[in-house]
Amino acid sequence: MLVVIACVCAALSALLGLAPYLVGGAIALGICVFIICFVSTEASLYVLIFSMLLSPEFGMGALAGPSSTTGGRGVTIRTEDMLLVIMCFAWLTRMAVHKELGLVRQTPLNQPIAWYTLACVLATGMGLIFGHVEGMTGIFFVLKYIEYFVIFFLVSNNIHSRDQIRRFTIAMLVTTFIVSIVAMVQIPMGGRVSAPFEGDQGEPNTLGGYLLFTGAVAGGLLLSLKERRVRGLLRGLLMLSIVPFLATLSRGSYLGLPIVYISLIVLKRGNRFPMIATLIVLIALGTAAMPQTVKDRILYTF
């Protein structure tokens, strides 16, 4: 343990010598986040929610590849990735202090997550053996997949009431609103819009997937809640987010949209006719009013 601490101190000293202000500020911020996570895991989850797509990203040197996008098979690290690592260490430290806390709460998804993770590890390992996958790039991609499961376990282990769920959901929808506004500002510049603070080569698919996921949550709430004011806010958020969603020109996100809508129809209790009628109207209006760039993206591969 002393050897590990000595190596970490030596590495930090070397980094401070290269970029004292930048690295020093990052270390100080990391220590603050660690303290927040240790004292209150709920507060750290709010930090994580708001950092989603509202934090800068950076390439991992050679891992950034020819392009900073996933399509270029490069690996990019966002600030929330680093926050998640710090949160995990704080979580483990907190569990060591409070021995009554369990490592992972039992949920119906635990076993499927374990099998999926095993499949990712085995597939990447075979790719490394046969030379189809670059070593560090493949490892970092698998780690970023596992990161989502870590978030799931962090949240599930720290949910204790419906009020917490409500507060986390509100924070997520507020983040979606901010992300949508920032993305809409990019539309007049031309090209595909991407998440904020991603530099010259953003990841439109990431933004499209994020808006699709949060839109599904907002749509589900719209169908289940009765308060008029809340329903009006949810409708406004959905109408706002659809504009940058289309501007991402993400085919994968487009393919997911009808699946989400059909799922909402199936899950809706009571009369489903209004949703089916709305779907028909949206298809008719979308065919006529959809921007040509979106039509070309759907109809043509190149």
Please describe what each predicted stretch is:
Residues 23, 27-29, 85, 89:
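Hydrophobic alpha-helical transmembrane segments
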Residues 147, 292-302:
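Aromatic-rich transmembrane-lumenal/periplasmic boundary elements in polytopic membrane proteins
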Residues 20-22, 142, 206:
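Outer-membrane beta-barrel domain signature
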Residues 130-133, 189-197, 298, 302:
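Membrane interfacial helix motifs at helix-loop boundaries and amphipathic/re-entrant anchors
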